[in-house]
Amino acid sequence: MSRYRGPRLRIIRRLRNLPGLTNKLVESKKNQASGNDQSNQKKVSQYCIRLEAKQRLRFNYGLTERQLLNYVRIARCAKGSTGQILLQLLEMRLDNILFRLGVVPTIPSARQLINHRHILVNNRIVDIPSFHCKPKDIITIGAPKTYQSIITKRIEAFAKDQIPDHLTLSLSEQKKPKGFVNYLINRESIGLKINELLVVEYYSRKA
């Protein structure tokens, strides 16, 4: 299954707000239907609940089905809670790190910066959005000056308290942004509201 490139509002109406996909907020179809007669509403199966959780995770981080399945398999082989390790793997992706730093408004826009070879990790160009960042990694932006100014304005308007504790963002005297990974993210700092155990249960027979 390929990465979704269709209308984003259609997705968030169905799956609720996904900050990584779009910063637009809409009322979900479930909330719109809350005023309807309860007798007309079908009981949602456990499978559908797990499927929705999986879809929320996949669309928020911009993954293909195969990519997400691979992450689940890696998480299963690691020591610790499979669900928390899965979220940690996704949150430590380079495209998501740029998004959480406030450098870009969404993960797709972060992926565009990376694909255009504008991002450096430890002074080396990285053009792989799924690149796994580690503690003590330093992330800088080598975009053209016109793009740098746009990024700088966004960072200056971005509330610093929105940056999670495992990351630090600073601006040099030349107004160039620099991100620093302090440590691996913990569960409390995950940006997406989701029950990761439902995702693990969904893949229990596939991974």
Curated annotation (Swiss-Prot):
PROSITE patterns: RIBOSOMAL_S4, S4. It is found in: Plastid, Chloroplast. The keyword Nucleotide-binding does not apply. Gene3D superfamilies: Ribosomal Protein S4 Delta 41, Chain A, domain 1, RNA-binding S4 domain. One of its GO terms (biological process) is ribosomal small subunit biogenesis. The keyword NAD does not apply. Residues 92-156 form the S4 RNA-binding domain. Coiled coil: none annotated. Keywords: Chloroplast, Plastid, Ribonucleoprotein, Ribosomal protein, RNA-binding, rRNA-binding. GO terms for cellular component: chloroplast; small ribosomal subunit. HAMAP family: Ribosomal_uS4_B (MF_01306_B). NCBIfam families: PRK05327.1, rpsD_bact. Part of the 30S ribosomal subunit. Contacts protein S5. The interaction surface between S4 and S5 is involved in control of translational fidelity. One of the primary rRNA binding proteins, it binds directly to 16S rRNA where it nucleates assembly of the body of the 30S subunit. With S5 and S12 plays an important role in translational accuracy. Belongs to the universal ribosomal protein uS4 family. This is Small ribosomal subunit protein uS4c.
